[in-house]
Amino acid sequence: MESDQSKVESDQSKMESDQSKVESDQSISQSTSKKRSQYSLRLEAKQRLRFNYGVTERQLLKYVCIAKKARGSTGQVLLQLLEMRLDNIIFRLGLSPTIPGARQLVNHRHILVNDQIVDIPSYRCKPNDIITVRDHQKSQELIKRNIKLAKIDEIPSHLNISYLEETKPKGFINKIVDRGSIGLEINELLVVEYYSRQA
């Protein structure tokens, strides 16, 4: 009888041990799943931001590093840096239907900033900068076509545009863009966290 009782207790102890192991495995699995889920959210936010502004991995990392050193919210500064790129400003002004198209305008020297040709798409614009089109027939024909394609309904509040003629737009930067004027629905802090955890 004692031997049978001992066997029952041994089996019960083994079952409890197995149950404990299963619970432990489930806990580890849930923890891993949660970590993976958080990582995938950060990765998705980073990819969306890259796609939206058409920047490379290296460029985005550089902007994150600059934003971390600046005063204010790192996420907000990051968005401001991306929004104030020349190619993005041209797109927001409605001078190109896409950011890649705006980048091409800059690369091909069709755009002037404060009456100087700028051929660097990542050029950081600042308040009071004036964006115009080169006084060249090809440049003006491109802009005329782009304006028809872009069909911008509303210019963001940090920008302004006027037309001396249909082919001679004049863009003006009123101020640094604020978060409310950025139409992108994204949690920029997830992007900052993504790069913080990669370091």
Curated annotation (Swiss-Prot):
Record flagged with keyword Ribosomal protein: yes
Residue spans crossing the bilayer: none
GO annotations of cellular component type: chloroplast; small ribosomal subunit
Any single GO BP term: translation
Primary location group: plastid
Annotated ranges, domain S4 RNA-binding: 84-146
Record field: compositional bias (Basic and acidic residues): 1-24
Keyword Ribosomal protein assigned: yes
Subcellular localization(s) per the UniProt record: Plastid, Chloroplast
Disordered: annotated segments: 1-35
Keywords attached to this entry: Chloroplast, Plastid, Ribonucleoprotein, Ribosomal protein, RNA-binding, rRNA-binding
GO MF, one example: structural constituent of ribosome
InterPro entries attached to this UniProt entry: Ribosomal_uS4, Ribosomal_uS4_bac-type, Ribosomal_uS4_CS, Ribosomal_uS4_N, S4_RNA-bd, S4_RNA-bd_sf
UniProt family annotation: Belongs to the universal ribosomal protein uS4 family.
HAMAP family per record: Ribosomal_uS4_B
Function: One of the primary rRNA binding proteins, it binds directly to 16S rRNA where it nucleates assembly of the body of the 30S subunit.
Quaternary state and interactors: Part of the 30S ribosomal subunit. Contacts protein S5. The interaction surface between S4 and S5 is involved in control of translational fidelity.
This protein's name: Small ribosomal subunit protein uS4c
Source organism: Psilotum nudum (Whisk fern)
Gene for this chain: rps4
